[in-house]
Amino acid sequence: MIRTMLQGKLHRVKVTQADLHYEGSCAIDQDFLDASGILENEAIDIWNVTNGKRFSTYAIAAERGSRIISVNGAAAHCAEVGDIVIIASFVTMSDEEARTWSPKVAYFEGDNEMKRTAKAIPVQVA
């Protein structure tokens, strides 16, 4: 059996640019890519917390330390500057591998200040 698992996630980053006329993609600060394990040109899903839209694109690197999250091309219709989004990538693996797999998650606040990283998502309590 093959399972699709969360590989990396940027939780609640703020969109800093939306460029309709730039060639597709989502430019992400290289520090953020490193923290989440997302690679340049990797397929990503973006879930817009602000407006509820969900879309897919691919990641490209933005300047390290810039805190840039730039939604580009047609995807710019799905996000505006200031929107809060979650960016995730997924990986496929065997059932055996999935049972011990840990994603790389980075949590953000304010103007894309990385507050912490984790290897798991906390259990949701009642």
UniProtKB/Swiss-Prot annotation:
Chain positions recorded as substrate binding sites: 57, 73-75
Biochemical pathway: Cofactor biosynthesis; (R)-pantothenate biosynthesis; beta-alanine from L-aspartate: step 1/1
Listed cofactors: pyruvate
Main location class: cytoplasm
UniProt cross-references to PANTHER family, sorted A to Z: ASPARTATE 1-DECARBOXYLASE
Originating organism: Salmonella dublin (strain CT_02021853)
Function according to Swiss-Prot or TrEMBL: Catalyzes the pyruvoyl-dependent decarboxylation of aspartate to produce beta-alanine.
Oligomer and partners: Heterooctamer of four alpha and four beta subunits.
Official protein name in the record: Aspartate 1-decarboxylase
An annotated GO BP: alanine biosynthetic process
Residue numbers annotated as active site: 25 (schiff-base intermediate with substrate), 58 (proton donor)
Protein localization: Cytoplasm
The protein's Enzyme Commission number: 4.1.1.11
Alphabetical list of NCBIfam families matching this protein: panD
One CC-aspect GO term: cytosol
Cofactor, free-text remark: Binds 1 pyruvoyl group covalently per subunit.
Chain positions with Pyruvic acid (Ser) modification: 25
Superkingdom as given in the UniProt entry: Bacteria
Listed Gene3D superfamilies: 2.40.40.20
UniProt modification remark: Is synthesized initially as an inactive proenzyme, which is activated by self-cleavage at a specific serine bond to produce a beta-subunit with a hydroxyl group at its C-terminus and an alpha-subunit with a pyruvoyl group at its N-terminus.
Keyword entries, A-Z: Autocatalytic cleavage, Cytoplasm, Decarboxylase, Lyase, Pantothenate biosynthesis, Pyruvate, Schiff base, Zymogen
